[in-house]
Amino acid sequence: MPRPIQAVIHGPALVNNLQVVRRHAADSRVWAVIKANAYGHGIERAYEGLRQADGFGLLDLDEAVRLRQLGWQGPILLLEGFFKPEDLALVEQYRLTTTVHCEEQLRMLELARLKGPVSIQLKINTGMSRLGFAPAAYRAAWEHARAISGIGTIVHMTHFSDADGPRGIDHQLAAFEQATQGLPGEASLSNSAATLWHPRAHRDWVRPGVILYGASPTGVAADIEGTGLMPAMTLKSELIAVQDLQPGATVGYGSRFEAEQPMRIGIVACGYADGYPRHAPGWDGNYTPVLVDGVRTRMVGRVSMDMITVDLAEVPGARVGAPVTLWGQGLPIDEVAHAAGTVGYELMCALAPRVPVTVEPAGAADAGETLGKAA
């Protein structure tokens, strides 16, 4: 028998979360962002739950080819664009929309011998300072793009840096509107946070990512309560041993946790080699939440490669084989990530290849077929 750990991808949750996005941005089309192997969920698995999107946004050509091989005939957006002139042959072959964020890409398009026009999203750097033309240079970039015969539709695009925080989007939205004033074309601005909380930025296309997978853009689980979003991944395992400790007994590498009174602990088949955060705390008043038999308890001691240890004070009847939820249904991934000093995005993407993945089909209420290992 394999180790009892597994990840479950909840297809119905993906369907639900896309519907939540549509309720928030009813007048916009939706790019469902599936970069980073669909945030660790697997492109092939996520596709089934998100196929009612208007288009898919992803990062590289390999992901785009995989999506076409699944049968998707709609729009696909390369969020970072292309990198080399030879990439344009695949952009054309697979009918991809590409982000264009620099003069070098415009020159490559100008020199390319394309059979037909390529749709682009021309990116403005309104404050993120990663990719995009400066607002003062944007109009010239747009004029350059419009003059290139190999370019068809041009959509105005930017990315918000503070849509999930107190600074908000006003400064970037003002820069975007000034840079695009009087220019024809659709617009795509909103990431997950702006999709939820800034309706005036929805425009023609929204680009939700992490909310499609049921996590919060802020990293705070409470911030998405009441939205209807559901976790699309549950990482679960079982107790594989139980230990009774006396006062003074220590737990794990470095003996960071010491029992102050008689206590029972459970050993869970899950460790950092499975993608659980090694830096998740379990000592000195800082503890990471875990569910055992559906009851909330805490991790104690350090995370090791293959195991963690949990306090069974709240579940005294737990025995070997008791179910354990590391994150997902019943325990928001953002709570675990917050305890570990990171964000839910990272935990999703860090799911290790050795963890078996089971898929709950998008049209079913019960857990479904196993599609192998996490890619």
Swiss-Prot record:
Keywords recorded for this protein, A-Z: Isomerase, Pyridoxal phosphate
GO molecular function per UniProt: alanine racemase activity; pyridoxal phosphate binding
Active-site annotation: 35 (proton acceptor), 253 (proton acceptor)
Pathway as given in its UniProt record: Amino-acid biosynthesis; D-alanine biosynthesis; D-alanine from L-alanine: step 1/1
Biological processes per GO annotation: D-alanine biosynthetic process
GO CC annotation terms, alphabetical: cytosol
Keyword Chloroplast found: no
Catalyzed reactions per annotation: L-alanine = D-alanine
SMART domains for this protein: Ala_racemase_C
Coiled-coil spans in chain: none
Residues annotated with N6-(pyridoxal phosphate)lysine modification: 35
Protein residues bound to substrate: 130, 305
Enzyme Commission (EC) number: 5.1.1.1
Pfam family, one: Ala_racemase_N
Cofactor(s) this protein cannot do without: pyridoxal 5'-phosphate
Keyword Isomerase: yes
Family stated for the protein in its record: Belongs to the alanine racemase family.
Function comment: Catalyzes the interconversion of L-alanine and D-alanine. May also act on other amino acids.
Name of the featured protein: Alanine racemase
Upper classification of the organism: Bacteria, Pseudomonadati, Pseudomonadota, Betaproteobacteria, Burkholderiales
